[in-house]
Structures are given as structure tokens and as C-alpha cells.
């Protein structure tokens, strides 16, 4: 089994990634490598945030690792909440209920409710230059996953996390929270980004 470090201590995201990757990989969290730091996310884009987190782990622990950042991009709001999705409601940090309430208020009365979830994964690969491992170089790779859909007028379902109760993926009439983990993990933005990461890893 291959071991790979995922730069997160978010148990929801960690379990989702483990479910997607299955038994082929041992996915290790930040806590499991001794990192309890809340790595800052100060980038202006999902790409910058994912790189920032992966770079921190690589610099401090010298291991191959990957990090992700995800944003919900709503067409009628010019792409908001986007990179600020986790902290969309002012004065809150990862408060999903407050974030959803704010988004529903802002879309109240709007006909266009088209939206998409976008995940960017940054994988920093440590490559040993000599057999003893005394010298190494890093390679940076980025993978993107997108799922289109629309925002419901109210919450539906109890599974999942984040904006799942109000996001209805394309070609479905139920929210992510209603579809359940098995279906969501097969079609989600994160699953699509992870699939591209796995495709790359299999070539190694």
C-alpha cells in the first residue's frame, strides 16, 4: 500500500479522500505526521491556497504531499463565494449553516441559480536525486475537478458537509446531501480532481 500525506486535519475531507482512493493508498493526515498547525490560506485563488498548504508541509516535513482547496462558484454572484467559500459569512470560520444562509439570502429572487463546485489539488512530489536520498528535488503538479449544478431554494438532506444541502449537481434532482456519500464520491468535484491525481501516480 502506498503512503501519501494529505495536508488537512479536516476529518470530513480526509474521510472523503480515503473513501475515493480506497485500499490502494494509505492517506495520512497532518496530525498523523505530527503537524497541529492551522496552515494559513491567504491566497487569492484556489490554486494559490492549495500550493500554500502543500508547500508548508513539504518545507517542514520533506515528504511528498498534496493539498486541496475547494470553492463554490455561483454565476449570478460573479463567482462568489469562490475562494472565500469556507468563511463566506462575516465573522465565521467554517460555519456551514451561516454560509448557506447568507448565500440563500443573496440569491433570493434571482432566476439564475447556476453554480459549480471546483476543487484544485496541488501535489508536491519529492524526487531523490541520488540513491541514498541525501539530495532531492521537488516537482509541483496541479489537478482540477469541476461539477456543474445549481443552488436549491432551501436545504435538503442531512449527509455530507459544507454547502452539500443546497447544491444540486447537474443531471440530478437531489442535493449532494440527499444523494449520499457513495453517489457523491463518484461524481463530485473532489473525486474528479483526485482521479486525475491517481492517474498521474499510476504512471510513476
Language-model features: where?
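Anionic-ligand binding patches
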Residues: 2-5, 11-204
Amino acid at each position: 500500500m502506498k503512503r501519501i500525506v494529505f495536508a488537512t486535519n479536516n476529518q470530513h475531507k480526509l474521510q472523503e479522500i480515503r473513501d475515493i482512493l480506497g485500499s490502494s493508498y494509505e492517506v495520512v493526515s497532518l496530525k498523523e505526521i505530527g503537524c497541529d498547525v492551522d496552515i494559513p490560506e491567504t491566497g487569492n485563488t484556489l490554486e494559490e491556497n492549495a500550493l500554500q498548504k502543500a508547500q508548508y508541509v513539504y518545507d517542514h516535513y520533506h515528504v511528498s504531499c498534496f493539498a486541496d482547496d475547494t470553492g463554490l462558484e455561483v454565476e449570478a454572484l460573479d463567482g462568489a463565494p469562490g475562494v472565500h467559500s469556507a468563511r463566506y459569512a462575516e465573522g465565521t470560520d467554517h460555519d456551514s449553516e451561516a454560509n448557506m444562509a447568507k448565500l440563500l439570502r443573496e440569491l433570493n429572487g434571482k432566476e439564475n441559480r447556476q453554480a459549480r463546485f471546483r476543487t484544485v489539488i496541488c501535489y508536491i512530489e519529492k524526487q531523490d536525486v541520488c540513491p541514498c536520498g541525501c539530495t532531492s528535488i521537488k516537482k509541483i503538479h496541479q489537478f482540477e475537478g469541476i461539477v456543474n449544478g445549481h443552488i436549491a431554494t432551501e436545504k435538503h438532506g442531512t449527509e455530507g458537509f459544507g454547502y452539500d444541502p443546497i447544491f444540486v449537481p447537474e443531471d440530478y434532482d437531489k442535493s449532494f446531501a440527499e444523494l449520499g456519500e457513495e453517489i457523491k464520491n463518484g461524481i463530485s468535484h473532489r473525486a474528479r480532481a483526485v482521479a486525475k491525481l491517481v492517474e498521474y501516480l499510476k504512471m510513476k
